[in-house]
């Protein structure tokens, strides 16, 4: 056995997958999973666990896989993660658990994400469920939002015995997992829906089409409906734009809208009537995972697609795997390039985009080298569609209808990073609603921390638990074009 290199994972051929929405990565089979698990040396001081935001016992579950004990491996994972089939597919393992793997010092790290995915898929196919709480607690908790933060918080609280209800604004649960990430990366019915069923099997109730701030408010939930604590995991769904001329033209979309139409509303399926712009020449502005998702979706809808990003490939925020897949599929990367103006025809439709070439100067506040325009380097791209993928911010609806809930200048909820506690008693928050747009696993970590904080809150004397906002710590997402 080659212990230095990963067991290769099967994928659809690039030319084939570029024409369909089936999952790109086909995952390990049993033999491949056992072989890959056998590369793990089972470190006692496991750095990989330190790199996992939800602290999965990685050597523990891999040891079970090595022995072919897949159900036991699932039990180990489900102690820490409510969404293992999701995480195994979309987490940036290369910068987290796998980035800490000792095997990576001499050779390639263990394929932790692919092994997690294998175990979760095996459990689903064999109808293995997480174990519900043995004892119930007489406390009601409301969770706002059914994305990764909300599902994780709800699942952990249910395991502790709490009576948990999730309130979801959309008609379908899943948050960014269903509207933001394409089918070819994260299958909805085969994976996401089953993960949500597992959370519900713990006793969690989910109410859809409930918009907090309109249908009801946090104060009403607590004062009139008997919820003793609330977790806000409502995400960050308001898109950002550049503010350049022509941005209001027909044919300009946010990546958020474009992906929602395709992913949640199934515009890519002929049997659905959801309208979506199927451009012939498309530019996606931005360099993060969302930009890659939008570009690869537009490609599958029949377009020639350009990624326009103002820094170099080294600074691309997207996962290396996503960039690699995009290149394999034929996405054109216009790097060190920045839009100046969207060109509009006499009927108000996009006809092109004026761009300027950039070079990297001194590092800015983010630590990355600041892009600087090269004078006289302007050029035009002929286009009919522009998709802006510049990051998102939280919707202010919840904060504006909740007295005593502080937000910062970006409209992110002010919350303690250690336990999710906000400035309003009994209210906790985490995920993108606090940090701005970040990753699925970081949102899950925040949901897990908040569940622990809520448990501590409901288990103690609650005479004085209000937190001064000056003691809170906030981290901010680095958006695509910063």
Predicted segments, located by residue:
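Feature captures the FAD/FMN-dependent oxidoreductase FAD-binding
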Residues: 135-136, 140-144, 196-244, 341-354, ...
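N-terminal Rossmann-like FAD-binding beta1-loop-alpha1 element of flavoenzymes
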Residues: 140-165, 291-299
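Single conserved hydrophobic/aromatic residue that forms the stacking wall/gate
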Residues: 467-482
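Ferredoxin-type iron-sulfur electron-transfer modules in oxidoreductases and energy-metabolism complexes
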Residues: 17-36, 57-89, 106-135, 262-263
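Rossmann-like dinucleotide-binding cores of NAD(P)H-dependent redox enzymes
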Residues: 163-166, 170-201, 206-207, 295-341, ...
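A conserved FAD-binding loop/helix module that cradles the flavin
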Residues: 433-458
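FAD-site-proximal beta/loop scaffold in flavoenzymes
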Residues: 248-279, 363-437
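Glycine-rich dinucleotide-binding loop and its adjacent helix/turn
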Residues: 119-135, 192-211, 239-301, 408-418, ...
């Amino acid at each position: 056995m080659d212990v230095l290199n990963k067991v290769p994972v099967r994928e659809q051929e690039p030319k084939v997958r570029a024409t369909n929405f089936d999952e790109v990565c086909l995952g390990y089979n049993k033999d491949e999973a056992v072989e890959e698990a056998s590369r793990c040396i089972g470190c006692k001081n496991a750095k990989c666990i330190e790199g996992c935001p939800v602290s999965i016992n990685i050597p523990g579950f891999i040891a079970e896989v090595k022995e072919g004990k897949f159900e036991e491996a699932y039990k180990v994972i489900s102690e820490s993660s409510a969404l293992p089939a999701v995480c195994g597919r979309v987490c940036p393992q290369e910068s987290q658990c796998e980035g800490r793997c000792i095997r990576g010092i001499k050779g390639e790290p263990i394929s932790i994400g692919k092994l997690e995915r294998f175990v979760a898929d095996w459990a689903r196919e064999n109808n293995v469920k997480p174990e519900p709480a043995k004892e119930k607690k007489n406390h009601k908790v409301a969770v706002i939002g059914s994305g990764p933060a909300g599902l994780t918080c709800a699942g952990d609280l249910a395991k502790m015995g709490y009576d948990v209800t999730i309130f979801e604004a959309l008609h379908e649960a899943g948050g960014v997992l269903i509207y933001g990430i394409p089918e070819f990366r994260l299958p909805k019915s085969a994976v996401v829906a089953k993960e949500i069923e597992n959370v519900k099997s713990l006793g969690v109730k989910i109410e859809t089409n409930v918009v907090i701030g309109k249908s009801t408010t946090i104060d009403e939930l607590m004062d009139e409906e008997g919820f003793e604590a609330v977790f806000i995991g409502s995400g960050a769904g308001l898109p950002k734009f550049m503010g350049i001329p022509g941005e209001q033209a027909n044919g300009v979309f946010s990546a958020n809208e474009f992906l929602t139409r395709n992913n949640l509303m199934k515009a890519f399926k002929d049997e659905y009537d959801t309208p979506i712009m199927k451009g012939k020449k498309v530019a996606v502005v931005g360099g993060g995972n969302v930009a890659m998702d939008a570009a690869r979706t537009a490609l599958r809808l029949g377009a020639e697609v350009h990624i326009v990003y103002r820094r170099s490939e080294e600074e691309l925020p997207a996962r290396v795997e996503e960039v690699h897949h995009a290149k394999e599929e034929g996405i054109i990367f216009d790097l060190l390039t920045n839009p100046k103006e969207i060109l509009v025809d006499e009927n108000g439709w996009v006809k092109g985009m004026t761009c300027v070439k950039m070079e990297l100067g001194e590092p800015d506040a983010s630590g990355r080298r600041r892009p600087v325009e090269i004078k006289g380097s302007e050029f035009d791209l002929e286009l009919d569609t522009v998709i802006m993928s510049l990051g998102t911010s939280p919707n202010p609806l919840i904060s504006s209808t909740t007295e005593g809930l502080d937000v910062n200048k970006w409209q992110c909820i002010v919350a303690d990073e250690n336990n999710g506690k906000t400035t309003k008693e009994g209210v906790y928050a985490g995920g993108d609603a606090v940090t701005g747009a970040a990753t699925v696993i970081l949102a899950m970590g925040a949901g897990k921390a908040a569940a622990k904080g809520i448990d501590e809150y409901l288990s103690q004397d609650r005479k004085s638990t209000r937190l001064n906002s000056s003691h809170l710590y906030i981290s901010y997402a680095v958006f695509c074009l910063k």
